[in-house]
Amino acid sequence: MDLSKWPLINWLAFLATIVINYFASGENAAVSDRIDIYFKPAGYAFSIWGVIYIALAVWLVLQLKKGSVANRQANRMKAGFLVSCILNGLWLLTFTNEWFIASLVVMVAFLATLAWLYYIAFRTSTSWLDRFPFSIYIGWVSVATIVNVFVVMNRERVTTLLGLDELAWTSLMLMVGVVLALVFMWWHRDFIYPLVFVWAYIAIFARIDNATLYVVLVSALILLTLGYVGLIIWKKPRAFLHHSRKTVE
């Protein structure tokens, strides 16, 4: 068992994050409910945090085994995981206090930190399982970052931007999300990341009441599904289970 600095710090940071999220979840939901934007998944979609935290907990257990893939990942991440936990809690602080511009700044930093953690996880192992916690984590925070942008626009009363209103920007960003998900899938041989977007888009569809967005969402989901299946057929399923990129021992 590896009880060195980073594995232990990671556990402490994770437990603190769970506690903070538990006590802040009610206020976070209340603030979110008061903000009426198109690009927002239905409440049930946020249950994905349970999957994320369970996956991270499993990874944290595995990182305690000296020499394991998770252990090598943790030691290469150094303070990265700790920083992600701090930013997670800091985002809750800014959002629940309705400091929305600050919350967006924190969210972007959070996403950048997760991108770094994902890169290390990707370079340490070829198996999709060894990066699953970070695939689903960065996927959901990618969606949350887009949501956060629309929250800021709403609270700052930005009704149009570059000549486009909220409906037009929502339609555009739904399609941008499709491209992002498929490019990420292709580049990293990651079949988990785009599934998070499918989950989010279905949840957005479940709560909206706008004919235009119905059409855009259905189109986005069809394109995402076709692209997803097409990439798997093109690259072969095995390429997504074990990528061929060079890893660091």
Tell me the role of every PLM-derived stretch:
Residues 65-66, 120-123, 230-246:
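Membrane-interface capping segments at transmembrane-helix boundaries
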Residues 35-48, 134, 158-172, 208:
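Short aromatic-rich membrane-water interface segments that cap or initiate transmembrane helices
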Residues 192-203:
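Central hydrophobic cores of alpha-helical transmembrane segments
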Residues 108-119, 201-203, 223-231:
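Alpha-helical transmembrane segments and their membrane-interface exit regions
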Residues 70-81, 189-194:
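Membrane-interfacial loop-to-transmembrane alpha-helix junctions, especially the N-terminal start
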Residues 14-29:
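Alpha-helical transmembrane segments of multi-pass membrane proteins
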Residues 1-11, 49:
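N-terminal membrane topogenic signal
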Residues 91-104, 122-128, 156-163, 183-187, ...:
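Membrane-interface helix caps and helix-loop-helix hairpins in membrane proteins
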